[in-house]
Each structure stands twice: as C-alpha cells, then as structure tokens.
Amino acid sequence: MYYGKSRVPKGIFSAGLDAGLILDVPYIGYLLQNGKQNILVDTGIHDNNIVNGKAWGGYPAEGGNKYVIEALKKEGLSTKDIDTVIYTHFHHDHTGGALLFKEAATYYQKDEFLNLLNPLPTQKNRCDYNIKTVDDFALIKNHCIVDGDLELPNGLKLYKLPGHTLAG
C-alpha cells in the first residue's frame, strides 16, 4: 500500500555512489487478508513529520494519515475494517497512522517499544523516532506485545528480525 514518498539523494543511503541521483522513496505498508480478516502491516509516516512539504533531512515529502485512508479506500476498506495492525519497527515512517486504528489488535516487539522510549544517540541525531508515538500508543486499546517469534491464531507467523532496528 502506498502511503506517500520522500524525494532524497541516493547518497544518504550509499555515500560516494551515484552522486546526484535523486530517488523517490515510498512510504509503504501491506494489507493481508484472510477471509474476512484485514491485517495492516505498518501505518505510514506521522503527519507532523512532514512540515511545509518536507520531511526527514529537509527533503521534499508527501504522506500522512490522508494517504493511509486513501490507500485503504482503493481496496474498498475504511480504517474501521482493519482488525489487526502489525508494526515491523517503530521508525516515524512506519507508525504515523497508529491513532487511525485504536480499536485494532496491535502487535509489536517489546524491544522495539523499549528502544522507542530510550533511543540510542545516533537514533536521536537521525530523528529515527517520533516521540509522539509514545502518546499515540497510550491510546491504543488492544496491545499485543511480542517478545520474540509468535504464531497468531490465524496461522500468520511473526519473526523477530533485528538488524535495521533492535527488533525489526
């Protein structure tokens, strides 16, 4: 699902390579459907991470809740149709629409939440996390905190894969 994009120089990902190449990097999520169950993986970038059409690093960007709502609409769904939300990790471009799904069962890794509460200095410098996420998640009604791998009742398997972040 397309939740918007940021337009950035490739060099921020691969210093010294492809100087001058500009990339459109999408904010994405996934919709998993099993019969009548609708599972959303990640919820896009926070509205407040895009200011005057710019996001992380001051690069042009578009996204936010209206993009999440529009992506669902293209699938014939609304926010109320989502039963479950799974977060791969808690970076600001993956958790922005959390409040759209306050009633949904919400799965995330314990280590990821702990890292959100206490980010490493480099994570603070890069602004990986949006501190508003803590307040947003306080309003979610059905937390399913995962500590490692887990198989959901519908057979979907969640695996803890640290690397990009401590848990995802």
Located regions from the model:
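A short catalytic or substrate-binding loop motif that flags glycine-/basic-rich loops and adjacent residues
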Residues: 22-25, 162-166
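Metallo-beta-lactamase
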Residues: 63-77, 81, 111-160
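Short, acidic/polar N-cap/turn motifs at the starts of alpha helices
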Residues: 27-29, 147-149, 168
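Conserved beta-strand hairpin/beta-sheet module of binuclear metal-dependent hydrolase folds
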Residues: 4-70
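A short secondary-structure junction signal
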Residues: 51, 97, 117-120
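Active-site environment of divalent metal-dependent phosphoester hydrolases
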Residues: 48, 90-95, 165-168
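Active-site metal-binding motif and surrounding structural segment of the metallo-beta-lactamase
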Residues: 58-108
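Active-site neighborhood of phospho(di)ester-bond hydrolases with catalytic His/Asp-centered motifs
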Residues: 40-43, 83-89, 108-109, 160-163
